[in-house]
Amino acid sequence: MAGLLVSKRLAACVQLVSKLESHYRWKGKKEISREILLIIKTRSSLYKKVEAAILKNHSYEVPEIICLPISKGSKTYLNWLAKETAF
């Protein structure tokens, strides 16, 4: 997933945080799963395309896809992010 998003220029960077254990309810049952958290660095204007790519390629019926706004960031980093996600 990470490689796909970066190669399609939908993300400038994707960090994988592994060895997570998620506890949740699914279809009336308590579940525990090992998961990998992806932190996807992209522009908000690409959200719908990123979401579509994740939904198409993810094994979960309802994967967690949330968007957190960047309230502040270094100008050089944000410029790099914009450049790497430009078409």
Model-derived features: positions:
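Positively charged, small/polar-rich N-terminal and surface patches that mediate targeting and assembly
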Residues: 1-87
